[in-house]
Amino acid sequence: MKKIILTLSLGLLTACSAQIQKAEQNDMKLAPPTDVRSGYIRLVKNVNYYIDSESIWVDNQEPQIVHFDAVVNLDKGLYVYPEPKRYARSVRQYKILNCANYHLTQVRTDFYDEFWGQGLRAAPKKQKKHTLSLTPDTTLYNAAQIICANYGKAFSVDKK
């Protein structure tokens, strides 16, 4: 009986200490870069959300479709790696923009242990595509207009 009580006490103590360690991991404050790296376009002033201009490409089968990556430099580290001291500093999102109807599809999200979507990649096991219709006069809609004007081909951008 004493062995059972001792075993349960040790198990409970271990479980409590594991939760405390995990809580400490969630509080990793980061200082994202203040200067915009060459090749990246900041979408909103004072927000760490960027388009990687070197990732932009036009679909050769459907020229109204433009593919690109958005990068978010995080201000709080995310523990998504198996190593307890490694954490994500940035998120890279692969997106597809349909310039004919301004539908934006987020295809994939990956975490990286360095800023600017660089370094060791960690991908969630299950990911779903999400598509939304961009609303006029929003930051994403304005960015989409610029991308479509510069990259999208053979389509009409008139939305009347």
Curated annotation (Swiss-Prot):
InterPro entries the record matches: Adhesin_E, Adhesin_E-like, Adhesin_E_Pasteurellaceae
Coarse class of the protein's main subcellular location: membrane
Transmembrane segments: none
Chain intervals for the UniProt region annotation (Interaction with laminin and plasminogen): 41-68
Stretches the record annotates as Interaction with vitronectin and epithelial cells: 84-108
Keywords, in A-Z order: Cell outer membrane, Lipoprotein, Membrane, Palmitate, Signal, Virulence
Subcellular localization(s) per the UniProt record: Cell outer membrane; Cell surface
Variant or mutagenesis effect after changing residue 85 to E: 50% reduction in binding to vitronectin. Does not bind vitronectin
Membrane association type: Lipid-anchor
Matches recorded under Pfam families: Adhesin_E
Subunit structure: Homodimer. Interacts with host vitronectin, laminin and plasminogen. Can interact with both immobilized and soluble vitronectin.
UniProt-recorded name of the protein: Surface-adhesin protein E
